[in-house]
A protein has these predicted regions:
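Conserved acetyl-CoA-binding loop-helix of GNAT-fold acetyltransferases
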Residues: 69, 75-88
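Conserved beta-strand-loop-alpha-helix junction that forms the acyl-donor binding cleft
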Residues: 99-108, 122-126
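Acidic/histidine-enriched, beta-strand-rich ligand/metal-binding domains
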Residues: 65, 108-112
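Short hydrophobic/aromatic beta-strand or adjacent loop that forms the aromatic wall/cage
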Residues: 33-34, 124-128
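Conserved acetyl-CoA-binding loop of GNAT-fold acetyltransferases
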Residues: 111-121
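Conserved GNAT acetyl-CoA-binding A-motif
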Residues: 90-102
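Charge-dense, intrinsically disordered terminal/linker segments
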Residues: 1-26, 73, 111, 134
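Acetyl-CoA-dependent GNAT
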Residues: 10-59, 65
Length: 134
């Protein structure tokens, strides 16, 4: 509830991206490389950071740290929808690439989304993948 006491006021004042994701945390209107966001949707959330070029495989990369679908909504395509909204968000903030580190069981999903393996290892047991966007 909003401090004014109006039940719907907090939801109405929530900051939304043009893609329909609400901003749980973020840098505000002034952002740059190193800025991080937590974006929520009806079925889950996305954690992402605009990487500094020294940490990215390619310049202008949005790194998706995590996409989480609510447990009771899994297996119905909500992860795909959430990712596609995150991809549009990346394009809108000027990213040219998206980079992820995938769990082994999710590599097929990310390949279907257009990602390719980089052959680099950043985290043990995970597969580094990238996708050119825009």
């Amino acid at each position: 509830m909003h401090p004014s006491g109006a039940p719907g006021e907090a939801r109405r004042r929530r900051s939304y991206t043009p893609e329909g994701l609400f901003v749980i945390t973020g840098p505000g209107e002034s952002y740059g490389k190193g800025s991080a966001w937590m974006l929520g949707g009806e079925h889950g959330y996305v954690q992402a950071v605009l990487l500094r070029d020294s940490l990215a495989i390619h310049p202008d990369t949005l790194y998706i740290e995590n996409i989480e679908v609510k447990p009771d909504r899994r297996g119905r395509g909500h992860g795909r929808i959430l990712y596609l909204k995150a991809e549009r968000f990346a394009e809108n903030i000027g990213a040219k690439w998206i980079q992820i580190d995938s769990e082994a069981e999710a590599v097929g999903f990310w390949s279907e989304m257009g990602f390719t393996e980089t052959g680099k290892l950043f985290y043990a047991g995970k597969t580094s993948m990238v996708k050119k966007i825009g």
